[in-house]
Amino acid sequence: MRFYSDKQFVKAFVEMNALRKNEQLCDVILEVEGQRVPAHRIVLASLSEYFRAMFTGEMAESKQKVVTINGIEEASLKNLVEYAYTATIEVSEENVQSILPAASVLQFEEVKRACSEFLRRQLDADNCLGIKVFAEVHGCNDLKVAATVFSSRYFSQVRKREEFLKLSLDEIQAFLSNDQLNVKSEFEVYEAALEWLLHKENRAQHLYEILKFVRLPLLSAKELLRSVGQNQLVVSNPQCVELFVEAVQCHMLPESSSKVTVARSSRIL
């Protein structure tokens, strides 16, 4: 007869956690922000490729009793060590932006995925752009995609938020170039671009770099002539004037501008 007890694994980790809390049989002390966190190497290595490489390789830490962990908050490290023993971690709005980076660095992949899913569920017009940047920094591709889709779908609301005005040049270019922007008309994209440009004085120099991502041929003739053609920033910039002329020609000679309109018309819903 082969006997198997599924309770044994749970009991083993419960007992190891008790030993950890009593600082018994601990063979490593993680030092973070001046605080000491005792643990067992085998438990950490079984959950984290980071610790496995550290403790089983040729790194100096493999022989050290005290190992310093840099770039991670004390509370987050303690939460992750607790998770290693209990398979439980509390993720909240208050701690997710510190736990996720720590889980990413220490390669607690399930915790990282849980944090990403938590943030995905929190997406709204106020935070989606910030979460997208956060996801990029920490290599959370699924979260980045979700935030990108959300911000594109709710462009009309997102463009009115403070996060939109804080976007960097590269970020605003990527946002405005998205084919999936859900807008009533391209004029809304033009207005958003101007709002971003006028938010800070030094942004005016980037007018062409921004305006080239606005699909001016999709504006109505009235919008082109009244809003673009009479904008002093536009008419004083030779490159922007070229964009304006191209857009006007699309209205005057549609048969000669099919390539422009086809290539730049896919996002209007």
Region spans (language model):
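Alpha-helical scaffold in the C-terminal half of BTB/POZ domains
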Residues: 2-6, 10, 37-39, 44-49, ...
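Eukaryotic intrinsically disordered and solvent-exposed regulatory patches
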Residues: 13-17, 24, 66-67, 85-86, ...
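Conserved AAA+ ATPase "SRH/arginine-finger" region at the nucleotide-binding site
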Residues: 68-72
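Short linear motifs in intrinsically disordered
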Residues: 12-22, 56, 123, 267-268
